[in-house]
Curated annotation (Swiss-Prot):
This is S-adenosylmethionine synthase. InterPro entries: ADOMET_SYNTHASE_CS, S-AdoMet_synt_C, S-AdoMet_synt_central, S-AdoMet_synt_N, S-AdoMet_synthetase, S-AdoMet_synthetase_sfam. It catalyses: L-methionine + ATP + H2O = S-adenosyl-L-methionine + phosphate + diphosphate. Gene3D superfamilies: 3.30.300.10. GO terms for biological process: one-carbon metabolic process; S-adenosylmethionine biosynthetic process. Catalyzes the formation of S-adenosylmethionine (AdoMet) from methionine and ATP. The overall synthetic reaction is composed of two sequential steps, AdoMet formation and the subsequent tripolyphosphate hydrolysis which occurs prior to release of AdoMet from the enzyme. PROSITE patterns: ADOMET_SYNTHASE_1, ADOMET_SYNTHASE_2. It comes from the Bacteria. One of its GO terms (cellular component) is cytoplasm. K(+) binds at residue 43.
Amino acid sequence: MSDFIFTSESVTEGHPDKICDQISDAVLDALLTEDPESRVACETVVNTGLCLLTGEITSKAKVDYIKLVRNVIKEIGYEGYRAGGFDANSCAVLVALDEQSPDISQGVNEADDVNDDLEDNTGAGDQGIMFGYACDETPELMPLPISLAHRLAIQLSKVRHENMLNYLLPDGKTQVSIDYKNGVPLSINTILISTQHNPEIDGITNEEEIRQRIKEDLWKNVVLPATEDLEIKPNIQTTRFLVNPTGKFVVGGPQGDAGLTGRKIIVDTYGGYARHGGGAFSGKDPTKVDRSAAYAARYVAKSIVKAKLAKKAEVQLSYAIGVAKPISILVETFDTGVISQANLTELINKYFDLRPAAIIKEFDLRNLPQKMGGTFFRKTASYGHFGRRDLDLPWEKVEEKAAQLAEASKVFL
């Protein structure tokens, strides 16, 4: 199918599930900042007036979890009259954390395929499959639908934080549908923005008048600024623009919906444009291959596309708990590759070390929170873990690897 419409969504940091992702990753940041060897699997639940921290943590760090949770919620914007029914200062915070299972710890500490190589001594923290993807649709080598959905969500949040539209509240979602012709993005078919807001705007109380006001404001202050540097831009005449289709969005955040860590895994990755192994990222330390190997898979896929060895590349990795080396490596280029997939796999095996300890070392994952002033992983917990133009992410820096692949591939051409 070469002509189609593809749709992806994003959410703001005030979405209930994203509140949870940020809290879980803020816990991870705090623990790794004090103790880079911390083992963390932190889950968060939010509901009306309640935040629950649970999971397994083994660490020498001392963290005031209740204070941390309240600070994250406050920074997102849920405080006082702008809280929308969920207040950082008054919500109950419950902490129910255990230590990591010794059975899991044993597998990570001493791999089944152990030898004299230090990187072989750290096994994967669990079994699983991870996918990485890249394509040439955007400068950051991401699919256009998810890239644009994130741009809109980021701008929506910026407008709220800067009080440009003082009636906006923290919860919000964006969705973008792109027209493809011969498999290439052609135009923006539909933009959908749902944003929480005050029940009254500048004295306006009529539901339809409020929705029309928000629609006009968002087109001017969110859609146009978010797309001004794109080759494919929205057109007020041809792009369908939907805002709060139910009519109003006053009740939102945890008051409107319960939130849970790890429920926005498609938003976190490629917007459904590529496959997903099912594992979430937030609240997990780097020994969890759900996170670290997914970063590595993106690193490999982006290096392939950056090297112009394919227009699209999807990399699957699989691991067994307690085993360092991947069980399998698969690359798919969707008939866009300039060399065979077998040759690409050969290059991957030669130029990328995909054992957990090697990935952690390559990206310095254990030390990044400390180096970044105590906050690193939390910043990835909203607006995607890949293709971020606003963050300095080591798995996005592929120039050196791409150059190696481009040179090495010449023997296959």
